[in-house]
Regions:
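Residue-level marker of positions within ordered structural domains that often coincide
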Residues: 35, 66, 70, 108, ...
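Exposed loop/turn and edge beta-strand positions of beta-sandwich/beta-sheet ligand-binding modules
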Residues: 16, 123, 213-216
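Short, glycine/small-hydrophobic-rich surface segments
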Residues: 65-100, 205, 237
């Protein structure tokens, strides 16, 4: 009987302890692997979100730069320097100001209740993109009163008033498509616009172009630098973002990720 019980005996205490240790090591290894993969995945998705936010804004500006100067064939609105297709006011970069762009193009409205021949009326719109200091609190600095170093991009749309020969106030112009400054994107580090003529030369000055050269802009380089909202890297390091504008490189010793997006928009309605 003793021999039979011996042959079906379970694990000894030592064997059980060894099994527990091995299982614990395996679980620790699996958790470590998961943490590494999860951290890497989170970094990749965070980077993608930051880049996508910048690309969405640049794509929007690009489409409207292409609209600059557009008018309908029978447009009868008197010409004015206020209707210059593109006007770029230069900034100096992070810590001070971004570039500002104003884009003007024509529109048309149809009133089926009007008499034939008077059913169409022409309009003029101005789109403006400009930066203002960000109002987000920097939670890495004690006190809760320090703002982050950066900007928020705002967009506005105004309609031309042919009676007063001025841009109307969106709050009182009865046009539902116009609006005053609306925030489009925050955590912006810089926004740059560089106009070029047909020979590929930079049109200098601020604002640019001048009234006499208003229709000489053939393309505009658009560049934006966007920062992550939270620390991205594990440790601080000096990282530099090279700007397309002279003297506006961004060098920061911190943990934030910055992405630069640059595109070229052709002003297809100018010089036609």
């Amino acid at each position: 009987m003793k021999k039979k019980l011996s042959s079906i005996a379970g694990l000894t205490l030592v064997e059980i302890l060894i099994a527990v240790v091995i299982s614990s090591l395996m679980m620790a290894a699996m958790f470590t692997s998961y943490s590494i993969v999860n951290s890497t995945y989170r970094q990749v998705t965070d980077r993608a979100k930051i880049s996508q936010a910048g690309r969405d804004l640049v794509g929007q500006i690009l489409r409207e730069v292409r609209m600059a100067g557009y008018k309908y064939i029978n447009d009868d609105i008197p010409a004015s320097t206020s209707h210059n297709p593109i006007k770029i006011t230069k900034g100096t970069g992070i810590g001070s100001s971004c570039d500002k762009v104003e884009i003007v193009f024509g529109g048309i409205e149809y009133d089926k209740g009007a008499t034939e021949g008077d059913r169409f009326s022409y309009t003029r719109y101005k789109i403006t993109y400009e930066c203002k200091k960000s109002t987000i609190i920097d939670d890495t600095i004690p006190g809760g009163a320090t703002l982050i170093e950066g900007f928020a991009v705002y967009k506005s749309k105004h309609r031309w008033n042919t009676t007063s020969s001025s841009w109307s106030d969106p709050a009182t112009d009865s046009d539902e498509t116009t609006y005053e400054d609306e925030k489009i994107l925050d955590y912006v580090q810089d926004l740059v616009f560089i106009p070029f003529d047909e020979d590929g030369r930079i049109i200098a000055g601020s604002p640019a172009p001048s009234d006499s050269a208003a229709y000489e802009v053939k393309s505009v380089d658009i560049s934006i630098v966007v920062r992550s909202s939270k620390a991205f890297y594990r440790s601080k390091a000096m990282r530099t973002i090279t700007s397309i504008a002279t003297g506006r490189d961004i060098s920061k010793d911190d943990k934030y990720f910055r992405d630069s997006i640059t595109v070229t928009a052709n002003t297809r309605n100018l010089g036609i």
